[in-house]
Amino acid sequence: MPAFFSLPAERRLQAWPQSEAPLSVSSCFQNRPPEPASFQNLRPEPASLQNLRTEPTSF
């Protein structure tokens, strides 16, 4: 359904079927698999959501 994705984000959420409601951002990050410990040890800054988010911000 290409026309669905051409809608603005607000209309897209309203048109989304209730049974397939998109997950909230917080639950998406809670369900992320844990990073390897070696990668966490190499990173000097504390892990924030911006540092973890590498995918496009289109939910």
Swiss-Prot record:
Q: According to the UniProt record, where is the region Disordered?
A: 27-59
Where do Polar residues bias regions lie? 48-59
From the Swiss-Prot or TrEMBL record, give the protein name: Putative uncharacterized protein encoded by RHPN1-AS1
Give the encoding gene's name.
RHPN1-AS1
